[in-house]
From Swiss-Prot:
Protein name: Small acidic protein
Bias kind Basic and acidic residues: ranges: 48-78, 153-171
InterPro entries reported in the protein's UniProt record: SMAP (IPR026714), SMAP_dom (IPR028124)
UniProt xrefs under Pfam families: SMAP (PF15477)
Signal peptide, first to last residue: none
Crosslink feature (Glycyl lysine isopeptide (Lys-Gly) (interchain with G-Cter in SUMO2)) location: K13, K62, K75
Modified residues (Phosphoserine): S15, S17, S63, S87, S127, S147
Chain intervals for the UniProt region annotation (Disordered): 1-183
Family of this protein: Belongs to the SMAP family.
Amino acid sequence: MSAARESHPHGVKRSASPDDDLGSSNWEAADLGNEERKQKFLRLMGAGKKEHTGRLVIGDHKSTSHFRTGEEDKKINEELESQYQQSMDSKLSGRYRRHCGLGFSEVEDHDGEGDVAGDDDDDDDDSPDPESPDDSESDSESEKEESAEELQAAEHPDEVEDPKNKKDAKSNYKMMFVKSSGS
């Protein structure tokens, strides 16, 4: 083995042989036949550009070569900015983020905006931490059931509270949300 090391010393570069220039790495010099086959080979190798053979070149058609005027540009930009601003306002307000479930519609305030979580001024609890959305939904359902019972009692003050009537009122109230609004 020491004889092999002496004939090829470590760290000495070999000179390039003249047959490396025509080796397998030089595919440009390969004889591929006619020009069409050469172009196909280059295209398949990713080196050649395919010529456009379609009838319609993008941007050359008369209907697509319409340029906008300055007024149209301004109008389009204003519309886009207003749409962007509206979407950012609704996203930041968080009004549409809450999942309310099927058949639920928020009660409209006197100024036309829906009730947003955290804006209730008539709450009497002084809890410092805000409720999670799941807690507020379950609380709102129990509040709805209680308000339905109160409405039932207000409509029929002379009736004695019967557990059966109470159960019927709850089921009727729940059925209002189950039934489709489009009858």
